[in-house]
């Protein structure tokens, strides 16, 4: 694990833009909540670690711009034969069937929309498959995120998920790109759109019971939304 005595800035909201984020404090808070934590200066180091850590397992990868940017699928494919990726369905396979295959794998990887310096993580979902797989079914879950996801506290983490991550995620999808948060100012309008991507908000307070490991990988780079 790289040196954690680092202070970085995270984009949260206009009022908190200049709030310094203490990585060491964040790691200690996560560890108090029974999460395993590893910190890396670069994405390359983090992917090398994941490749050495996850071998000969049944693996599922949730929808995550961070994991796509890091090319985690390609790296893990070199050392694991059984990989289900929500972004890579089998020919003719429905989204639902692909999502169901991500459940119950030995290992599940995803990211988070926000990580509070106080040790909680936040994810927001439209369909719910990502947060479902991250909370139950796998023996080990890895949350991989960049420094830009870190916020001072839980309230600002929820703010970030709703007003920063959700609008950016809406823009990347053809249907959800018509949502107000994607077309207008980037913020939550609490809309009633059928293609709304923020129907459920999950707060990870502590490691789930009966799960072997919930590990948080923090990278000192801006990654994902």
Model-derived features: where do they sit?
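Short linear motifs at secondary-structure transitions and domain/linker junctions
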Residues: 11-15, 34-37, 82-90, 97-100, ...
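Conserved phosphate- and dinucleotide-binding cores of soluble alpha/beta proteins
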Residues: 103-225
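Iron-sulfur (Fe-S) cluster-binding modules
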Residues: 1-33, 49, 54, 168-178
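Short, mixed-charge, low-aromatic patches
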Residues: 1-7, 30, 89, 109-118
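N-terminal active-site beta-alpha-beta segment that forms phosphate/nucleotide-binding
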Residues: 19, 23-99, 104-109
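A near-ubiquitous, low-amplitude feature marking generic local secondary-structure context
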Residues: 6-9, 13, 29, 33, ...
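Short N-terminal helix-initiation segments at or just after the protein's N-terminus
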Residues: 2-5, 84-91, 221-223
């Amino acid at each position: 694990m790289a040196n954690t005595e680092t202070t970085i800035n995270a984009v949260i909201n206009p009022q908190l833009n200049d709030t310094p984020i203490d990585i060491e404090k964040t790691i200690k808070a996560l560890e108090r909540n029974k999460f395993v934590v590893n910190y890396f200066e670069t994405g390359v180091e983090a992917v090398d670690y994941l490749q050495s850590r996850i071998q000969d397992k049944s693996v599922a990868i949730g929808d995550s711009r961070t994991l796509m940017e890091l090319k985690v699928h390609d790296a893990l494919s070199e050392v694991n034969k059984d990989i289900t990726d929500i972004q890579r369905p089998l020919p003719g396979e429905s989204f639902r069937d692909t999502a169901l295959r991500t459940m119950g794998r030995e290992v599940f990887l995803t990211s988070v929309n926000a990580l509070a310096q106080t040790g909680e993580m936040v994810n927001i979902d439209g369909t719910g498959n990502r947060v479902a797989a991250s909370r139950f079914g796998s023996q080990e879950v890895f949350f991989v995120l960049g420094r830009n996801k870190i916020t001072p506290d839980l309230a600002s983490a929820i703010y970030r998920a709703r007003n920063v991550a959700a609008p950016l995620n809406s823009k990347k999808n053809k249907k959800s790109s018509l949502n107000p948060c994607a077309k207008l100012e980037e913020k939550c309008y609490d809309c009633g759109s059928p293609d709304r991507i923020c129907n459920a908000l999950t707060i990870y307070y502590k490691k789930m019971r009966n799960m072997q490991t919930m590990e948080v990988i923090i990278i000192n780079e801006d990654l994902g939304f």
